[in-house]
Every structure is written in C-alpha cells, then in structure tokens.
Amino acid sequence: MSHSPAQLSASPSSVGDGDRLLRAARGEVVDRPPVWMMRQAGRYMAAYRELQSKYTFKQRCEIPELAIEISLQPFRAFAPDGVIMFSDILTPLEGMGIPFELVEQQGPIIDPPIRSQAQVEQIRLLEPEESLPFIKTILSTLRREVEGKATLLGFVGSPWTLACYAVEGRSSKDYAHIKSLAFTQPQVLHQLLSKLADSIARYVIYQIECGAQVVQLFDTWAGQLSPGDYETWALPYQKQIVDQVKARCPQVPLILYINGSAALLERVGKAGIDVFSLDWMSDMAEARARLGSLAVQGNLDPMVLLGSPKFIRQRTLEVIQKAGSRGHIMNLGHGVHHTTPEANVHHFFETVRQAAELLKAL
C-alpha cells in the first residue's frame, strides 16, 4: 500500500530505545515514560478513514494486509513507544461457537444472546491457530516492522466484559440481562466465565507466541460492578487467565484496563497483573498510592486532546509528574476520541518525548 508523505512525518527510528515500554511495564526506571494511546489506530486518522470507507470492520481486522497497515499508521505518524495490533476484543468468539456481527456505528450484535445452561454447554474451547490463522501473520509481520523501535502489544477482552456482550446481545447501559443471570442463575454465569477465561488464556499465549511482547486485558465493563461483585464475577476470571499465561510465559508483562475503576484499585492487583491501566476519573498520585507496587498506565482524559497545545502540554506533564519515574506508561484514560485533530495527537506524543526537559523548566 502506498504511504503519503504526511504519514511518514515522524521517524520511529529517531527516538530509539524500542524496549522502553517493555522495561516500564516490568517496573523499571526509564529515561522518560513510554507512550502510546488506546485506539491509536482509528477514526481520528484520515488514513484510517480512507480504508474504513472501502472495507468492513471485520475485513479491516481479519485481512492481514489491512490490519498490519492500520496498526502501522500511527506508528509512522507519531512514533509511539508501543504498537498495538488492530483487532477487536470479540474476534475470538466465533472460534468458541459464539457468532456475532459488527455493525458500523452500532457495535457488536450477538443473536441469539447466551442466556441458558444449554447454550453455555455448547461453547467450545478456542483453538487459536485453527480459528484465527490471520493473527499469526499480523503479529509476526508487525514484530518485524517495529523491532528495535517500539514494543508490540497484543490484547484481549477479559471474561466479564466478553460475557456482557454475549449475554446482553449488544452494548448496554444497565447490564440488566447479565446481572439478572448473575443474581438468579449464578452457576450458569460462572460456567460461562470460566469457559471464556480458559479460551482467552489460550489466545493470550498464542499472541505471545506470534510476537506480542506485552498483552493488555480489557475488562472495560468490570467498573459496572460493586467491589464485592467485582471479586465474585470479574477478578477470579482475570486471575484464571493471568495464572495460565504466567505459567507458560512468566516474563511477558500483562496490563489490565477497567473503565470506572476508582472503587476497585485496592483489589485489581489480586489478579496478578503487572500493570494497571487507569481511567481518567482517578487522580494519578492518589491511585499510585492505592495501587501499591503495581506499575501503572494512563491516565489523561481523552478530551484534553481537544484543547489547545498549551493545555495539552500542561495536563500531560501533570500526569507524568504525579506518576513518578518508575513503572509508568503514559496513555489516555480511555480510547482517543474520533474527533481529535491529528496535530493535537502529535503534540501529545512530542510533549511526552520531551517530558524530562519540560519538567525541569517548571
């Protein structure tokens, strides 16, 4: 595929130190915080929108040439320290016998939704190499492309969040169906979550074997649970994944992201993860104190990137200062908003790259 001069404006090789993110994820002190953005490959980029107009979302995720190109668009434009595979958290579900449809601007539709013991019993264990052959091509190619210049991230959905989609059948505001299942037929939901955890653990290990150096678990909707329910319905299945992955790949850092995690910060470390990805609704300094020795990722409000360059710089440096020098990966507290100007994203990345000098000048 051809690349316009604008896409080639940043030079990843010029920033060097391709393992900066990997080392920060292991809790090491680095020269500056590594930086990448959730949803950094996406609709805010003109280059992405051009492909979006020609190919379905499923095609963009599963045709290796497209997924590789989309993953590399922000790498060429902004030289982040982390490059994440372009995919979707629901991608492995079909290989488990849970078909879904991705509808533009609507999100995923799972019809029929999974709400009975009989349906749960039909779910099979994922065989990633058979069901997701494109993943190996995507990750192995990306690893070659970014080797020595950036850390390659894989990602998966965590069981509670995947179950939210499977049981609700679509995006939800109140999670009535899954909470009803939890509170009336708990054994059915526990069985579903355990099956999901075993398959997702396999998928994480497969991503690592294909080239991923760090893997992020998205349990986005676990923040919809009370602390007690989090310990019943989300935490054990996060841990089930982490335990299986660490038994096979002990050196690979695992990141956990939960949206709306403020009430859960003392609990998330029990999952055994290496890094907790913080949303923007918690103060970074307070969160670090509550998270203890865990490395942390985040947590700039994505909407800050709609502000002026001066405002973006100020708020970015505030987060970095509060996070301290050890075990911090700079990121947003959620995915970058699709209306964000690319120039503002560039300014955000440049601010982080210059953070040491800029903080000295304060």
From Swiss-Prot:
<dbReference type="GO" id="GO:0005737">
    <property type="term" value="C:cytoplasm"/>
</dbReference>
<feature type="binding site">
    <location>
        <position position="165"/>
    </location>
    <ligand>
        <name>substrate</name>
    </ligand>
</feature>
<dbReference type="InterPro" id="IPR000257">
    <property type="entry name" value="Uroporphyrinogen_deCOase"/>
</dbReference>
<keyword id="KW-0456">Lyase</keyword>
<comment type="subunit">
    <text>Homodimer.</text>
</comment>
<protein>
    <recommendedName>
        <fullName>Uroporphyrinogen decarboxylase</fullName>
        <ecNumber>4.1.1.37</ecNumber>
    </recommendedName>
</protein>
<keyword id="KW-0210">Decarboxylase</keyword>
<dbReference type="InterPro" id="IPR038071">
    <property type="entry name" value="UROD/MetE-like_sf"/>
</dbReference>
<feature type="binding site">
    <location>
        <position position="334"/>
    </location>
    <ligand>
        <name>substrate</name>
    </ligand>
</feature>
<dbReference type="InterPro" id="IPR006361">
    <property type="entry name" value="Uroporphyrinogen_deCO2ase_HemE"/>
</dbReference>
<dbReference type="GO" id="GO:0004853">
    <property type="term" value="F:uroporphyrinogen decarboxylase activity"/>
</dbReference>
<feature type="binding site">
    <location>
        <position position="88"/>
    </location>
    <ligand>
        <name>substrate</name>
    </ligand>
</feature>
<dbReference type="GO" id="GO:0006782">
    <property type="term" value="P:protoporphyrinogen IX biosynthetic process"/>
</dbReference>
<dbReference type="Pfam" id="PF01208">
    <property type="entry name" value="URO-D"/>
</dbReference>
<comment type="function">
    <text>Catalyzes the decarboxylation of four acetate groups of uroporphyrinogen-III to yield coproporphyrinogen-III.</text>
</comment>
<feature type="binding site">
    <location>
        <begin position="39"/>
        <end position="43"/>
    </location>
    <ligand>
        <name>substrate</name>
    </ligand>
</feature>
<feature type="binding site">
    <location>
        <position position="220"/>
    </location>
    <ligand>
        <name>substrate</name>
    </ligand>
</feature>
<comment type="similarity">
    <text>Belongs to the uroporphyrinogen decarboxylase family.</text>
</comment>
<comment type="pathway">
    <text>Porphyrin-containing compound metabolism; protoporphyrin-IX biosynthesis; coproporphyrinogen-III from 5-aminolevulinate: step 4/4.</text>
</comment>
<keyword id="KW-0627">Porphyrin biosynthesis</keyword>
<feature type="site" description="Transition state stabilizer">
    <location>
        <position position="88"/>
    </location>
</feature>
<keyword id="KW-0963">Cytoplasm</keyword>
